[in-house]
Design a protein with these regions (language model features):
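Conserved nucleotide-cofactor-binding alpha/beta core module
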Residues: 74-193
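Class I SAM-dependent transferase core
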Residues: 1-82, 90-94, 98, 111-117, ...
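Core SAM-dependent methyltransferase catalytic element
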Residues: 178-216
Length: 216
């Protein structure tokens, strides 16, 4: 497989055809070496339009959904980002190219350990990796952007409270086979609005049933 040709086809045939045109996003995807983040058994499918299985019943998002996630958040180079669900680490790498600091958390130690090794290999230094539940974070921590990589049954208000004013959050909500990707924008400490981006289905975020959510 010619990696650069496959990467270029993925961007042209999957991301661009799904309205991902932001050049900074496309360049972040290009630089992040997706082939390094897929399981060995799926190396030949690294650039395919499919959800690649990971351990613990988790999956990589398709490239086009990853692209839309990145573009919808309108990331800025001076922002601090929270990624909920490290997973394969590919999206973590993409976020690192578009932010000042990316804090990525996962409850599965294998995911954060493997991602740390891969990011070190790529010489990515602006990522903090933690093995913990999102609701175990310091209550005083607030982020300009939150990217949630697995689906939730509904919006959890506690996640919105982690956003700074004017902060944005990407989240997929619902139950299979009906889910939708949302962009949440926080206006003030109490006020926020949501925009429906597209319909999709992705695996639930690990541990979503561990806490009773405060849902709206």
């Amino acid at each position: 497989m010619n990696l650069e040709e496959a990467r270029t086809r993925m961007i042209a045939q999957q991301l661009r055809t799904w309205d991902v045109f932001d050049n900074q996003v496309l360049e972040a995807v290009r630089q992040s070496a997706r082939e390094l983040f897929v399981p060995k058994d799926y190396y030949d499918f690294a650039f395919a339009d499919m959800e690649i299985p990971l351990a613990y019943n988790q999956y990589m998002m398709t490239p086009k959904v990853e692209g839309r996630l990145l573009q919808s958040l309108a990331l800025k180079a001076d922002e601090k980002i929270l990624e909920v669900g490290t997973g394969s680490g590919f999206l973590t790498a993409c976020l690192s190219h578009l932010s000042k600091t990316t804090v990525s958390i996962d409850i599965i130690p294998q995911f954060t350990t493997d991602t740390r090794q891969k990011l070190n290999h790529l010489n990515i230094k602006n990522v903090e990796l933690h093995t913990k539940d999102v609701f175990d974070l310091n209550n005083n921590d607030q982020f300009a952007v939150i990217a949630i990589t697995g689906s939730l049954p509904s919006i959890d208000e506690r996640l919105i409270q982690m956003l700074r004013p004017s902060g944005r959050m990407f989240v997929i909500v619902g139950q299979a086979p009906v889910m939708e990707a949302l962009l949440i924008t926080k206006n003030t400490n109490e006020d926020w609005m949501q925009e429906t981006l597209f319909e999709t289905v992705v695996a639930p975020l690990s541990n979503t049933n561990h806490h009773e959510p405060f849902v709206l």
